[in-house]
Structure formats: structure tokens, C-alpha cells
């Protein structure tokens, strides 16, 4: 939920770890295009949901984007996930799978809703005028699958 995925922010964590040089301007696409207002709305919505039991887990899509957030959540929850990359909301057309997986943004969160409470989660995000999309499901096989 939150902002749509774009090509900005890809490998941003790697960029942030490098020394800044005269050539760093060539790496500007690695820098995320921030949206502080969207981030504030997302913060409010996630705090509201965190106070309920409608959510099983939440993870930001900061460093390494979807690939890292799904891995972290799956590990913490001792579960797996199946993620349909075609369902990931995109700001730009024709993004490659690796771009979708590695795009980093502070205005996006991965959330696992409690089974049967999905509409409640959607209602909170609608209240805050934030997009929310189902991009996959939790599995019990311990594997991460992206297709």
C-alpha cells in the first residue's frame, strides 16, 4: 500500500553506502523521488491499523524494495509468499521484474492482513485516500515465489 512503484530508488541503499564523487550525479535514478505528504498519510494509516488485530505483519519497502520486505516478513513469520508482480501498482509502464523487486520507497508498505479482515484494512486505507492492492498471498511452504 502507498505510492506506486517507479524506477526511481532502484539500488538506492547501495547508492547511500557509496562515497559521493563527481560521478555521483550519474547515479541520480537511484535516489527515490520522495513524497512527504504521502508518507505522512501512510504513517497515520499504518498506526491506525497497528492498533487493531486486522494486520498480521507490516514491513516498509525501503532498502531492496519488495524482495527484501517479503524475505524479512517470511523469515519473521516462518512462512513463504507468492507474489504476482503484474499486480504491483506501477508509476511507469514496462518495468522489468528486477526493477519492481528492487525499487525502494519510504511511501510503500507490505502488509499481511488477518484472514477475513481484508475489507477492514481496505477501509482504513480508503479513509486516508491511499491505494492498497493485493499482490500475493502467504504460504506455508517457506518459499518466496515471484511470478
Locate each region found by the language model.
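Glycine/proline-enriched, intrinsically flexible loops and inter-domain linkers
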Residues: 1-147
Amino acid at each position: 500500500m502507498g505510492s506506486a512503484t517507479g524506477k526511481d530508488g532502484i539500488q538506492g541503499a547501495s547508492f547511500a553506502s557509496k562515497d559521493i564523487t563527481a560521478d555521483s550525479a550519474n547515479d541520480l535514478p537511484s535516489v527515490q523521488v520522495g513524497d512527504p505528504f504521502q508518507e505522512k498519510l501512510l504513517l497515520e494509516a499504518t498506526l491506525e491499523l497497528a492498533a487493531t488485530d486486522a494486520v498480521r505483519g507490516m514491513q516498509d519497502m525501503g532498502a531492496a524494495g519488495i524482495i527484501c520486505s517479503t524475505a524479512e516478513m517470511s523469515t519473521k513469520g516462518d512462512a513463504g509468499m507468492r507474489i504476482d508482480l503484474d499486480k504491483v501498482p506501477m508509476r511507469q509502464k514496462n518495468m522489468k521484474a528486477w526493477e519492481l523487486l528492487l525499487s525502494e520507497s519510504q511511501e510503500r508498505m507490505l502488509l499481511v492482513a488477518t484472514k477475513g479482515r481484508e475489507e477492514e484494512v481496505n477501509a482504513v486505507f480508503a479513509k486516508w485516500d491511499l491505494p492498497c492492492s493485493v499482490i500475493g498471498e502467504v504460504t506455508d511452504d517457506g518459499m518466496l515465489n515471484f511470478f
